[in-house]
């Protein structure tokens, strides 16, 4: 489903992929291009296929798009089924950002506010993101009290059970962007 957002320009994509030489990056470029203007993106791939690099560039493009449309920097959230997985994604994004900034063709300074927004994103379990009430049941964020997030990335999405995924989808604002990341060959919960 497309949202009423401005499309990312080819110039923006060239800036994000400046100096690229790997064939695999054409698929990454296509994934980033497809994410812009959509409310839901599913990114799959096995270990070492560049999912984290793609997510970083996708978040930068989505952040830039959000700022262009709203005039505000987005509220970004990073989550995973486990705290360890969420922290691993946050650390991988930090390492990817360092590589983007120190390569032969670092991204331009106009991308830095978006880079800072991505790196400042809170990493949490999906339960914590939703404000789990523990043994009392339910979540603080739901359809009546939506999650204060413009862009949400969930890593290892195949490990989410259907109840938790339903709660997450129900807690998102109508204009929020959800990026589900995972390995199609990973065992589901």
What are these regions (language model features)?
Residues 1-189:
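Conserved ATP-binding/catalytic motifs of P-loop helicase motor domains
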């Amino acid at each position: 489903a497309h949202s009423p957002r401005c499309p990312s320009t080819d110039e923006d994509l060239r800036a994000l992929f400046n100096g690229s030489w790997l064939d695999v990056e054409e698929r990454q470029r296509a994934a980033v291009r497809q994410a812009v203007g959509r409310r839901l993106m599913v990114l799959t791939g096995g270990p070492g296929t560049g999912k984290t690099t793609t997510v970083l560039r996708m978040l930068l493009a989505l952040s830039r798009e959000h700022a262009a449309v709203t005039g505000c920097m987005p509220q970004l959230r990073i989550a995973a089924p486990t705290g360890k997985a969420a922290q691993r994604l946050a650390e991988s994004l930090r390492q990817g950002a360092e590589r983007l900034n120190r390569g032969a063709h670092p991204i331009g300074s106009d991308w830095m506010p978006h880079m800072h927004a991505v790196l400042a994103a809170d990493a949490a379990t999906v339960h914590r993101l939703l404000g789990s009430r523990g043994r009392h049941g339910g979540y603080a964020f739901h359809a009546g009290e939506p999650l204060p997030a413009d862009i949400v990335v969930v890593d290892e999405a195949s490990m989410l059970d259907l109840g938790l995924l339903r709660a997450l989808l129900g807690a998102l604002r109508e204009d929020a962007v959800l990026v589900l990341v995972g390995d199609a060959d990973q065992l589901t919960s």
